[in-house]
Curated annotation (Swiss-Prot):
Assembly and interaction partners: Monomer. Binds 30S ribosomal subunits, but not 50S ribosomal subunits or 70S ribosomes.
Compartment(s) of residence: Cytoplasm
Protein name, UniProt field: Ribosome-binding factor A
Main subcellular location: cytoplasm
HAMAP family: RbfA (MF_00003)
Pfam families referenced in this protein's UniProt entry, alphabetically: RBFA
Record function comment: One of several proteins that assist in the late maturation steps of the functional core of the 30S ribosomal subunit. Associates with free 30S ribosomal subunits (but not with 30S subunits that are part of 70S ribosomes or polysomes). Required for efficient processing of 16S rRNA. May interact with the 5'-terminal helix region of 16S rRNA.
Length: 133
């Protein structure tokens, strides 16, 4: 299980350093909102790192939101070479994984489920205090 611990440490390091790099070094004005890295999965050979991101701070309709997320992923994937180079300077390993960015839908799914639960609770018949009689 030592390999699993090594991959977890590497993923944690990549997540921490990439968060800082995106916040401080990436100066693209199209990156509206706060880009948050929600998770990183590193391949066993350290060749690739799948980086899952969410974008906060944009109040858009669902269609605009989809386009904004795609645009953010395009920007990050185009900057992946620069980010990988900077990452290799910060993380002292023999191999620096190639970065692949993906949109993390767990937040959106959680909001969707919360909305369904709220609607179900509102649709429940109101309890009357007839039980006390």
């Amino acid at each position: 299980m030592a390999g699993g611990q090594r991959l977890k440490r590497m993923a944690d390091s990549v997540q921490r350093e990439l968060s800082e790099l995106i916040r401080q070094e990436l100066k693209d004005p199209r990156l509206g909102g706060l880009v948050t890295i929600s998770g990183v999965k590193v391949s066993p050979d350290l060749g690739y790192a799948d980086v899952y991101v969410t974008v906060m701070g944009r109040e858009l309709s669902d269609d605009q939101n989809e386009v904004a997320h795609r645009e953010t992923l395009d920007i990050l994937n185009k900057a992946s070479g620069f980010l990988r180079q900077e990452l290799s300077r910060r993380i002292k390993t023999r191999i620096t994984p190639r970065l692949r960015f993906h949109y993390d839908k767990t937040n959106a799914y959680g909001n969707y489920m919360f909305g369904l639960i709220e609607k179900a609770v509102q649709d429940l018949p109101k309890r009357e205090s007839d039980d006390e009689e």
